[in-house]
Design a protein with these regions (language model features):
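Short, small-residue-biased leader/transition segments that mark boundaries at the very start
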Residues: 2-9
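PLD/PLD-like phosphodiesterase catalytic module centered on the HKD motif
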Residues: 10-182
Length: 182
């Protein structure tokens, strides 16, 4: 059911599960769409997860106090920022690989003010159609190569560039909302 920020986020139970899977040689994954990442305890847990072998994708629009891609520390963490014409406030948490995958929609960013001083919630998603939609949305955001910027180990954001078909996640979702995607 519905869980408060202290239980779901700060205690980091879900990441601990993924760390255990990774240490057992199993595939382990976590994905997050947030506006900000500043909470030191969560950052420390993300680093521990990366060191254990958990693959972590993060879409963080704004403040981010974690440097990804540092060998031996955060090399399993990828962080991108997408800033487009729409101000987004959605938060998605994904834990687990394949059949173990769990999805949450949440109100909290990973900021101390949200995890300690505010009442925030994360709601599990049980409906398979909604799970599929959340994964599709997350995948589109990760494939954005127009507005996305990737945070590198040098602490700088660099344009995501590739030779693939141009993808602008916000424009994709806008068009999809109006049934313009073929």
């Amino acid at each position: 059911g519905l869980v408060g920020s202290e239980m779901c986020i700060r205690d980091r139970d879900m990441l601990d599960e993924e760390i255990a899977h990774a240490r057992n040689g199993e595939e382990a994954y976590a994905g997050f769409k947030l506006n900000s990442l500043t909470d030191k305890k969560i950052i420390d847990k993300l680093i521990e997860a990366s060191e254990a072998g958990v693959k972590i994708d993060m879409i963080i629009r704004g403040i981010c106090c974690l440097i990804p891609g540092v060998k031996g520390k955060t090399e399993n963490i990828r962080i991108i920022s997408i800033v487009g014409r729409f101000l987004e406030h959605s938060r998605i948490y994904i834990f687990g690989s394949k059949e173990r995958r769990k999805y949450y929609i949440a109100s909290a960013d990973f900021m101390t003010r949200n995890t300690v001083r505010r009442v925030e919630v994360a709601a599990p998603v049980y409906n398979n159609k909604l799970k599929t939609k959340l994964q599709e949305m997350f995948d589109v955001m990760l494939s954005d190569n127009q507005k996305a910027r990737k945070l590198e180990a040098d602490g700088n954001y660099h344009r995501v560039s590739n030779d693939l078909t141009p993808v602008n996640a916000q424009e994709y979702f806008y068009a999809e909302a109006y049934h313009e995607i073929p």
